[in-house]
Every structure is written in structure tokens, then in C-alpha cells.
Amino acid sequence: MVLCMKYDKLTQKKSVLDRCRPLHSDIVRNLDDWFRVELTYTSNAIEGNTLTRRETALVVEKGLTVGGKSLTEHLEATNHASALDWVKEKVAATQKNISEKDILKIHDVILKGIDDHNSGQYRNVSVRISGSAVVLPNHAKVSYLMEEFADWLATDNDIHPVEFAAEAHYRLVTIHPFTDGNGRTARLLMNMILLMSGYPPAIIRKRDRLKYITALETAQLGGSKEAYLKLIAKAVDRSLDIYIKAVKGEDAEQENGDTLLKIGELAKAVGEANSTIRHWTKEGLLEVSDITDSGYHLYATDTIERIKQIHVLKKKRLTLQEIKRHLT
């Protein structure tokens, strides 16, 4: 029910954006340029690339070399940007179903010059996800599973486009058909589906990396997909807001910033004790965006707004469980 409401909200926001089409060419160009850098930066950062957002922009937009960074990190940036360009060209040229060939093409561009032997090729070895209990399919089954996956992609379905895109991402990373580049390929596939459906791309923020990986793993180990599907829906929601605010002439690009607050900083900002923040986190009212090497919780800046909402609801004498249900 909660997810259905979220998808209804996305449909409504898309309708608002659709009523503004065609967008002015300057707005389209600015958004395309920003999303190109942001998607490249975040997708690579999730996989461990150390280029900052600014460095990624210099590499992708200016073709510059950043001192102290490896050739592979530079190639990961330029390759992802090129793969995204190909995806957008494909979307603009046709509305046909996505094929295995398309997925292999995305992967080929992602690993170009990094691992030419395996780029655009299904794996022929067994692989594991480092630090995860998820057991991936035997390499002998990959070709069959990908054929089955492509058939599923081509099948008419009645689920919401955002859920369909998220499910496609989930299924591809669970098959894990490549030796490397599975996550980046899956996120580009997801965004290809979103673009084909008239939605903006979903950006998985660097600060959401832990939630993203945990939600995926929970589902892959037989648990609920709800947290994962909510995360993707929220990412699309943010992108819709960015587009709508751009049309209105408002600056929304900073919404994907990576500033994280320590518990003391958050507590001071909202006038609460550290112990209260810890308690609300334990009760599920607040989400931890990341954890330091020392085990300290870090919170996104938008947690401040959530706590303000909690304050309002507490004044109405709602219990913590009632507040949690209200905010979900």
C-alpha cells in the first residue's frame, strides 16, 4: 500500500512535468549536462572510484587529467559518461524493447580500455560479492538466465514503470552476468527504462551507498524488497523535483550533495540530545546514511527536516510508533 502511494505520487509529479513539455532547450541542455556528471560521479563512487564530483566534471567535460588518480579511475568516468550518451541516443532513436545486445553494449562501453578481454562478454568463471553472503549463479547458467531476463524485459506488464525499472536492476545484479561492472551496467539499464517511460534518471547518492547495498542484499537473501524499491522510488522523486524546479527557475542541484552530519552536529542543529537521536534511530524514525571506520553514525542533512516533522507530530501527542507510521 505504501509503495502504491509512492508510485501514485511519482505519476502525479510526472504529469506536472509533462504539462511543461517541451522544455526550453537551455533547460534541457543544463539538466543533461548536470545529470551526466552526477550519474557518472555517483555510480562510480558506489563502486569505490575516488574521483570527487568536481574532478569527475573536469575529466568528463574538459578531458583533463587529475593528478594522483589512476588511469582506471579516469577511464571509469569517461566510459560511464559515454555509456550514458549511448543510452540516451538509443532512447531517442527507438521505443522498442531492450535486448541482450543492448545490455552487452552498455557493459562493453563501461569496461572499454579497462578490461577489453571481458568487456561486453558474459563471465565464464564463478564470482562472489566481497563481504556478502549472497550466492551468485554458476557461470554455466548465465547465458540461459540472461535469455530469460531479456524475455521478461520484452513482456508486457502492468506494474508501474519505476517499479519495473527497479526490478530490472535487481534481476540483473542478482544474475551478475559479468566479471566486473555489474552495478554500473544495472544502474544504466534501470535509467534506460526510466527514460523510455518518460521519467528522469534515478541517482543513487554516494551517501546512500550503505542503504542501497544493504537493501539489495536483504532482497537477494530472501528478505523483503520494500526497502530497495522505496530507495529507488525516492531517487526518482528527487530527480522529478530537480526537473520541476528547473522549469520554475529554481536551483535544485544541491539536493544530491554528500554533506553528512555527525550525531552531535545533528543533535545541535535540531536542539535535541545525542541520546534522543540514538533512540529515534534505534526505533526506526531516523535513517543512518553511512558509518565511519570507527563505527560512528552519519546522517544526511535532510534528516533535519525529518526531525522537524517529528517535533510537530510529538506536539500532537502521537506515540513513536504512530509517528513512524505517519512518516513512512
Regions found by a protein language model. Give the residues of each.
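Aromatic-rich, solvent-exposed beta-strand/loop patch
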Residues: 300
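FIC/Doc superfamily catalytic core
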Residues: 1-180, 184-288, 292-297, 306, ...
